[in-house]
Amino acid sequence: MDRTYVFLCIACEFKGGAFLRQLKRLGHTVFLVSSEKNKNEAWPYDDIEEAFFMPEKDGRKWDINLLIAGTAHLFRTHKIDRVIALDDYDVWKGARLREEFQIPGMGETTARHFFDKLSMRIEARDAGIPIPGFTALFNDDTIREFLKKSKGPWLAKPRRDAGSLNIRKIADADAFWHWSEETGDTRHQYLLEEFRPGIICHVDSLNYNDETLFTRASQYLDAPFEVAHGGGIFHSKTMSTKDALSKKLVNLNMKVLAAFGLRHGASHSEYIVRDGGKEILFLETSARCGGAHLTDMVEAASGISLWTEWANIEHAVLTGKKYHLPMVDELQAGIIVTLCKPEKPDYETFTDPEIWWKLHKKYHIGFIFQHKTEKKIDELLSRYTKVIQE
């Protein structure tokens, strides 16, 4: 029988239940650290040895020294074998803990490629991966040169914020310098990037021993930036694995993950597709499963639970056993999620057999559809969008 290993899992947001459950099924001891606000969420407490909650409400602003001190206290009685970061904002915390306690896994330098948008762009540029023009915001002369050579508008992006959070659109050079004054001493925490409109696609993957074993490309029907800043309905749909654009995205994604140094685990990456797929630009990546229930959509299409398989990969790495990816389905799926006025929407009138999943969250309504054809998924997303808007 394999020995029991100890996992310390960090999740500033409520997520990763399937990962925690699978580790327990495999015989491991699981400790969880989350934010105090998540204490009453439906964590799989029966599978967790002990849960600890940080006092800060904002997971981006945990006291790292308190986290280190708490980990040191736990380490006195439990030899921690792995630290796993389940959310974007946990990647740097996990790396810091690994460095502090000399635990194997991704260190702080490599981790920056997966949470620091500036580091991502520098790494991509140096690897010859196509990206929008960008500049760090350290030196005024460098910025002036970039503004002179580059064509606006631009996006000022926080280096450490996930997705589209706190991104500011900058129309011209004067607007940039006005924003720079507003930002003050925190300007270095941002980067400036050319705004390159296009279709935003995402690629969800599993890596094992430096090899990408599973990948599924999907397309947002509304750019996340527009949804985050203008409200509206969140949509995405998977792409056929036989689609030419999907194949291009998969190949580019493999190059990105190899260049960035992801050895094992899950990743969620985003790309800008322009000119009908003739140009694909890298946007960002991460060393964790995708959010917004995109993992559920991928599972509906492929039969692969990214959270579960990530746990299986961690188990294989620790025990020295070879990991085998389960059989992959070739179906299509789509997701639609938005806010609604009722606290608990009435789902009884939605009876289409293609409904694979329903969202149960206060003041939200959402569905995942599953079918063998992309055409049917498109039809369902269009029809349900109209119904929800009414």
Where do the PLM segments sit?
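ATP-dependent carboxylate/phosphate-activation module, predominantly the ATP-grasp catalytic core
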Residues: 174, 194-262, 266, 273, ...
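A conserved helix-loop-beta module that forms one wall/lid of the active-site cleft
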Residues: 99-166
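Short beta->alpha connector loops
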Residues: 10-15, 35-36, 89, 137-141, ...
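Conserved ATP-binding module of the ATP-grasp superfamily
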Residues: 130-132, 153-156, 165-202, 218, ...
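ATP-binding N-terminal substructure of ATP-dependent carboxylate-amine bond-forming enzymes
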Residues: 1-109, 382-389
